[in-house]
């Protein structure tokens, strides 16, 4: 029932085919309706990376809601591309604090939870579902719902599970089949991740054990040695900066003012060093087999936030109420000025 004249009008866009004809036409040409319309519901890894980093850059330059609306439209367009939705969830989690008020921030967290729930309920890829579950738990913590977070991940992330103790199995298997290249690479990756995890864990430990001075002081002593030994201030500036900042908070609670400014000075120096360079994940002379792994990460090795937003966060960190007794101290004023001047150069 399709005439040449009808097809000619479709080709010249004078008219469109009846929607009921689309399945018939698709069957005739041996393609799906999506293929017939030129609709591609799935994105490749490089496409996802580009969209993520483009949106992250726009968050630093454009009105927040304008970028959020653009990302929401992309979510609707690629609602069945679960790897993309996972990265949008990460994007929203990394930027929701820049919404104009707490109510708006909470609304974005709620949207992100809904997106993660959609992934978990519909995606067939277990690894993507597990990542979405962990993200959902993080959002629950941010929303003040710790019990819901526990219900989601307590069993999955339990240290009693064999999966949490099995990093050496893959390394040993590669070694036994003679693939020493992968064995060495995976060993370095495992060591690198455990190093970061140890410092992150110590940072959290200092935060909630501030009343136990002896334990905190010993933790700081050990972590300072570890950070220097592995040159972490150059290897992973973000982890090192967060550690020094948390120690500064602890020392302010202990009224060790000289210690506070020594740590805040390191915090500011590391942030500035991070922004002066490429600001990408990297190895060093010891961890020299990580590059391929970094390149293979879902978002590549680039920062998950734009440099300007990283600097804005650092400026906000110095406004922490814990430092209010020092607000007129020239040293704090100077550190704030350093970050402000750095912001003007970006």
Residue ranges and their predicted role:
Residues 41-42, 72-79, 117-125, 153-162, ...:
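Solenoid-like repeat scaffolds
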Residues 45-52, 78-85, 96, 124-133, ...:
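Generic helix N-cap/helix-start motif at coil->alpha-helix transitions
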Residues 198-329, 333-334, 338-346:
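Alpha-helical protein-protein interaction modules
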């Amino acid at each position: 029932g399709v005439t040449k004249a009808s097809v000619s009008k479709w080709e010249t866009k004078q008219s469109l085919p009846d929607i009921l004809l689309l399945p018939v036409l698709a069957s005739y040409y041996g393609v799906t309706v999506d293929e017939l319309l030129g609709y591609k519901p799935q994105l490749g890894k490089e496409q996802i990376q580009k969209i993520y980093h483009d949106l992250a850059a726009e968050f630093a330059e454009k009105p927040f809601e304008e970028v959020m609306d653009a990302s929401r439209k992309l979510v609707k367009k690629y609602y069945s591309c679960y790897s993309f939705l996972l990265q949008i969830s990460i994007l929203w989690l990394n930027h929701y604090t820049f919404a104009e008020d707490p109510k708006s921030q909470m609304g974005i967290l709620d949207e992100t939870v809904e997106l993660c729930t959609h992934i978990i309920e519909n995606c067939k890829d277990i690894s993507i579902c597990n990542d979405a579950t962990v993200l959902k738990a993080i959002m629950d913590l941010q929303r003040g719902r710790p019990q819901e977070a526990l219900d989601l991940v307590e069993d999955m992330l339990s240290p009693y599970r064999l999966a949490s103790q099995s990093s050496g199995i893959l390394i040993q298997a590669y070694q036994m089949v003679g693939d020493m290249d992968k064995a060495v690479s995976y060993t370095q990756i495992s060591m690198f991740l455990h190093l970061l995890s140890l410092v992150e864990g110590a940072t959290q430990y200092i935060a909630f054990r501030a009343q136990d001075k002896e334990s905190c002081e010993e933790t700081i002593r050990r972590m300072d040695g570890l950070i220097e030994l592995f040159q972490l201030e150059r290897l992973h500036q973000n982890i090192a900066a967060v550690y020094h900042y948390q120690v500064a908070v602890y020392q302010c609670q202990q009224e060790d003012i000289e210690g506070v400014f020594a740590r805040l000075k390191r915090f500011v120096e590391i942030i500035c060093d991070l922004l002066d360079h490429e600001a990408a994940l990297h190895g060093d002379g010891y961890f020299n087999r990580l590059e391929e792994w970094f390149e293979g990460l879902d978002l590549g090795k680039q920062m998950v936030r734009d440099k300007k937003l990283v600097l804005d966060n650092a400026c906000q960190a110095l406004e922490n109420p814990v430092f209010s007794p020092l607000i007129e101290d020239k040293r704090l004023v100077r550190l704030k000025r350093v970050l402000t001047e750095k912001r003007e150069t970006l």
